[in-house]
């Protein structure tokens, strides 16, 4: 039975989603840094973590202490086909169910080195513009570049729907998880 939502958030977007989900599922949400003080080892949880350079932050540590039933990860990129498969590959997720949500950028909350990494990401995404002009970048990539340069949020409650659908199917199999939706 899933008992809690554990999350790691750097600038607040993952935390915001965790709070939304906590309300919808009537489950407590807890920052990963407090999981050991708050929960017994081995309980079943949903893990939510922001993506930093393709890696889901805090996941490995949480996996050592808790039993993770599903992972929700929050990033800035617009997902392309194969995106989830790549996340599986980079994070050794085996057969864990993984869901991706778009968060946002708050430049004022980032360290200098984090800004540098993001600037490089933006430069790479915007590279085709140098060769072929503005028409050569997709709208989705343009939005990401713009968010990286000026901050932006993609957080909305509807983004949780795919996960909620999965969660409901799980609770039909296991009636002890009773979501309050
Ligand atoms: C240093 C750095 C690296 C990042 N790498 C990725 C990445 O590889 N893929 C992605 O989709 N988003 C990436 N992002 C974007 C964050 O995952 C995104 O801003 C997310 O919403 C942050 O969530 P938080 O506010 O909970 O920390 C990166 C952000 C930073 C600062």
Where are the regions that the model predicts?
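FMN-binding flavodoxin-like domain, especially the glycine-rich phosphate-binding loop
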Residues: 45, 51-181
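A short beta-strand-loop structural module common to alpha/beta enzyme folds
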Residues: 27-49, 72-75
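Structured loop/turn residues at secondary-structure junctions
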Residues: 9, 50-51
């Amino acid at each position: 039975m899933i008992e809690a939502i554990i999350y790691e958030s750097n600038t607040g977007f993952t935390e915001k989603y965790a709070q939304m989900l906590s309300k919808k599922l009537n489950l407590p949400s807890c920052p990963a840094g407090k999981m050991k003080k708050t929960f017994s080892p081995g309980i079943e949880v949903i893990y939510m973590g922001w993506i930093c350079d393709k890696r889901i932050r805090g996941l490995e540590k949480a996996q050592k202490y808790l039993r993770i039933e599903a992972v929700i990860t929050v990033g800035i990129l617009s997902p392309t086909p194969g995106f989830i498969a790549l996340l599986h590959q980079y994070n050794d997720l085996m057969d864990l169910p993984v869901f991706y949500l778009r968060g946002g950028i708050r430049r004022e909350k980032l360290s200098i080195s984090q800004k540098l990494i993001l600037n490089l990401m933006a430069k790479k995404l915007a590279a085709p513009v140098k060769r072929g002009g503005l028409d050569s970048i997709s709208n989705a990539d343009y939005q990401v570049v713009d968010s990286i340069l000026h901050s932006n949020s993609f957080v909305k409650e509807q983004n949780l729907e795919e996960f909620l659908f999965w969660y409901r199917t799980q609770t039909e199999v296991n009636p002890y998880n009773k979501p309050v939706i």
